[in-house]
């Protein structure tokens, strides 16, 4: 599950206030899809996930939070999706990162937003190099590291979480 702070940053970078369709690649149990659906009830969300256990939990979460605007697509991206998107979130690449970036750029409307999160430095490097190779301008890259207050004996300390890399970029053009 995408942690709350990472999810908030990713959703902000997706600029969903101007979107009508979001694709969530590697949706997992649906934390990003559910949060987006709750914040933007008019948004259509395509959640792609390959893991059967995660798909079951994703469907349970969709029902629990009454998010009828989430369509669940079992399988592996890239896949055929008829409708282009205004925003794509990639929370996992399954080892096909450059293929997924290429597919995302084809699947996005002009001026559409792509946001990706990584925990591995190698995936960050591959993504940045590939976006540069594609000529994508204005790539925004952040490292987010959040610490949470925890108890230690009779005292408290901030327990660090692992850092997460967030890349946000925009497809060239203007969406009408």
Positions of predicted regions on the chain:
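Conserved alpha-helix/loop element of class I SAM-dependent methyltransferases that forms part
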Residues: 3-18
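Conserved class I S-adenosyl-L-methionine
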Residues: 19-28
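Conserved Rossmann-like nucleotide-cofactor binding loop
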Residues: 28, 53, 122
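Conserved SAM-binding loop of SAM-dependent methyltransferases across substrates and taxa
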Residues: 29-41
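Short beta-strand element of Class I
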Residues: 42-46
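S-adenosyl-L-methionine
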Residues: 48-89
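Active-site segment flanking the S-adenosylmethionine/decSAM binding pocket
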Residues: 72-115
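C-terminal substrate-binding/active-site "lid" region of AdoMet-derived donor-dependent transferases
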Residues: 103-165
């Amino acid at each position: 599950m995408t942690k709350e702070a990472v999810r908030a940053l990713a959703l902000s970078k997706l600029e969903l206030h101007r979107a009508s369709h979001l694709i969530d690649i590697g949706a997992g149990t649906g934390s990003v899809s559910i949060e987006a659906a709750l914040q933007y009830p008019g948004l259509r969300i395509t959640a792609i996930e390959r893991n059967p256990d995660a798909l079951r939990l994703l469907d349970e979460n969709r029902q629990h939070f009454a998010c009828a605007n989430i369509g669940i697509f079992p399988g592996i991206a890239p896949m055929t999706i008829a409708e282009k998107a205004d925003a794509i979130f990639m929370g996992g690449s399954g080892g096909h990162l450059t293929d997924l970036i290429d597919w995302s750029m084809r699947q996005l409307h002009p001026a559409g937003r792509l946001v990706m999160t990584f925990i591995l430095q190698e995936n960050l490097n591959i993504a940045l190099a590939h976006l540069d190779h594609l000529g994508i301008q204005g790539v925004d890259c952040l490292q987010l590291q959040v610490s949470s207050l925890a108890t230690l004996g009779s005292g408290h300390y901030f327990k660090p979480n692992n850092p997460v890399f967030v890349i946000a970029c925009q497809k060239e053009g203007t969406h009408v």
